[in-house]
Amino acid sequence: MNKRKIGLAMSLVIAAGTILGACGNSEKSSGSGEGKNKFSVAMVTDVGGVDDKSFNQSAWEGIQAFGKENGLKKGKNGYDYLQSKSDADYTTNLNKLARENFDLIYGVGYLMEDSISEIADQRKNTNFAIIDAVVDKDNVASITFKEQEGSFLVGVAAALSSKSGKIGFVGGMESELIKKFEVGFRAGVQAVNPKAVVEVKYAGGFDKADVGKATAESMYKSGVDVIYHSAGATGTGVFTEAKNLKKEDPKRDVWVIGVDKDQYAEGQVEGTDDNVTLTSMVKKVDTVVEDVTKKASDGKFPGGETLTYGLDQDGVGISPSKQNLSDDVIKAVDKWKKKIIDGLEIPATEKELKTFKAE
């Protein structure tokens, strides 16, 4: 009996020790000495910066939403970001966040593909996610979008809203990604007005508001009355030029189509009731970032996977701000949206555009 009692007592002690040990191992230390078991997340911006009113800002809003929902504080052991002033900062910033032991680190933008690949190799115990590119590594989740689908819809809106039949597209840097915006947009215009002309210009960067303004000025002077920009912070220059023209002549039809976020507020002409934002192609980076971060915090990080979001996944679309679209245009956009969700393939390259037939 005594031996049995001693054995039972020892078993209880061992069991208790095991439980305590497991608790101790699951606790993640934070610099503030509080917040055990907290998941930390951070991001590195592209050169457009965290306030670009576009995809960098949208990604940060997704991280902030996750942080606030989970009681995290901005900074180390919570949620944070580092801004890149040039592409030379990408690797340095990613490495800095990795050294600070963030659980998940985002690289925002396809230009960070090489840097994410390099740091992911060096930091195999850290999870990374890249937006708008594919990095085939077990500790990297690749997040991509069908930008051509949302761009097609705003192309339909542009073609049906334009009075001149001359439409513009301003891109940041010419690349495979931005061509998806351009080609999808042109396909949408072509689908409803084959006679419309789309003038295409690239600014050579996503942080060149002055170039965006000058490009818009040239386009509007040539008779273009709607410009779709896919240019990050460069697009603020397009808005500036449109607002200046509208302020000079309130009766003039001059429109901008925003990108990534609902940019209706960006089109407000100061001191008036006028707004030059026709609509926006929203790319729901914020929602996707929050969702992927939640999966990672739940132990379901999609490492090694490529996640693609289109209209059917509610990853892209047309903005809810439709004050400047007529009822007929909205109905047409909705009709084409249904066609795409039902299987209409929207072109993403010049080659695909040449053989595209709207149904």
From Swiss-Prot:
Q: InterPro entries, from UniProt? A: BMP_lipoprotein (IPR050957), Peripla_BP_I (IPR028082), PnrA-like (IPR003760)
- One Pfam annotation reads Bmp
Predominant localisation class: membrane
Q: What PROSITE patterns does this protein's entry cite?
A: PROKAR_LIPOPROTEIN
Task: Identify the keywords attached in UniProt to this record, alphabetized.
Answer: Cell membrane, Lipoprotein, Membrane, Palmitate, Signal
Domain of life from the UniProt record: Bacteria
Location of this chain's protein in the cell: Cell membrane; Membrane raft
Q: How does it sit in the membrane?
A: Lipid-anchor
Q: Which Gene3D superfamilies match?
A: 3.40.50.2300
> Covalent lipidation (S-diacylglycerol cysteine) residues?
C23
User: Any idea what a deletion of this gene does?
Assistant: A null mutation does not lead to any detectable defect in guanosine uptake. However, in the nupG-nupN double mutant, guanosine uptake is reduced to an almost undetectable level.
Record keywords: Ligase included?
Answer: no
User: What's one GO-annotated cellular component?
Assistant: plasma membrane
Question: Which positions make up the signal peptide?
Answer: 1-22
Lipid-anchored residues (N-palmitoyl cysteine) = C23
Induction notes from the record:
Transcriptionally regulated by CodY.
Function, as annotated: Part of an ABC transporter complex involved in the uptake of guanosine. Is probably the substrate-binding protein of the system. May be a nucleoside transporter of broad specificity but with various affinities for different substrates.
Q: How does it assemble?
A: The complex is composed of two ATP-binding proteins (NupO), two transmembrane proteins (NupP and NupQ) and a solute-binding protein (NupN).
The record's comment on protein family reads: Belongs to the BMP lipoprotein family.
Q: What is this protein called?
A: ABC transporter guanosine-binding protein NupN
**Organism this protein belongs to:** Bacillus subtilis (strain 168)
